[in-house]
Amino acid sequence: MVKKILGQCYIWLILILMYLPILVLIVFSFTEATNVGTWTGFSWNLYPRLFQDAQIMTALGNTLILAFVSAAVSTVLGTLGAIGAFYSKKRTRKAIDSVTQIPIVNAEIVMALSLTVMFVFLSTYVFKAQLLSFWTLLIGHVVLSLPFVYISVKPKLEQMDPSLYEAAIDLGATPRQALTKVILPETLPGIFSGFLLAITLSLDDFIVTRFTRGAGLLSGDSQIETLSTLVQAKIKKGPIPVEMRALTTIIFLIVVLAVVLISIRRHYVDKKHAQGRVRG
């Protein structure tokens, strides 16, 4: 009984430590106080002010475009890489798995510096032109996210019967049909998880963005600004803009809504599969 109570207390303590700062931020998004901790009265004004701030809206647009494009590219490459490794020889598969683990455990600053050195070398000795741009930033985010997509898809492939592909080919399907009709549907939950994880990594990233960014995508500025780099730049000059509290609240609520919808859909799919097994 005592162990059960202590276990529940420990779980609640972890949850409080995780979500209390977010709840404080949400509460103070409804006041115009400059400093968190000083309540100057309830107000919605931060939310309309957020959408009137051109600098924040540009950074938000850059961040979302970068996140979704890099996630899409990472998902395609990571999924194809996982499928290719799954159907490779055992030694080749182990080698690919090991290589894929390195960027995950490696320090992000090492990856960022390596990409920067590579882009500078190519700019100086190969293309003879400035390369740092939105495209180099996109490459950096794809390199950052791709291994996580790979490890999200890989378990779903391992749960699948490896003979399904050969069976589809034997029944007259082309390799492309076997991939799209058999392999991809079986791995779709892992692909979707990898896609969401890639979006999260891109939205959250600062180090790779700081080292590989170039000209702005939406504003044409000398350097593209994302939310992470904008916050860092604002901190150097003074306090974080109060409108950021409203923005982070909106992002958090969208994430919560997405998680709830995904959980409902997963419950519905699992229930449907269970009913199908009972009928079978």
What kind of feature is each model-predicted range?
Residues K3-K4, F68-T100, V120-F121, L179, ...:
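Transmembrane-helix boundary motif in ABC transporter permease subunits
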Residues M1-Y10, L17-L20, K154-Y165, I169, ...:
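C-terminal transmembrane helix and the adjacent membrane-cytosol boundary/short C-terminal tail
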Residues L46-Q55, L203-I264:
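Interhelical loop and adjacent transmembrane-helix boundary motif
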Residues K3-I11, L80-L115, Y165, P189, ...:
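Cytoplasmic-entry segments and transmembrane alpha-helices of multi-pass inner-membrane transporters
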Residues K3, T34-S70, A233-P241:
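Periplasmic/extracellular loop-to-transmembrane helix junction in inner-membrane transport proteins
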Residues L20-A54, R213-S222, V278-G280:
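Short membrane-interfacial helix/loop motifs at transmembrane-helix boundaries
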Residues N35-G37, W44, I109-V143, R176, ...:
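Membrane-interfacial helix termini and adjacent extracytoplasmic/periplasmic loops
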Residues Y10, L15-I22, Y150-V153, M160-P162, ...:
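Transmembrane alpha-helices
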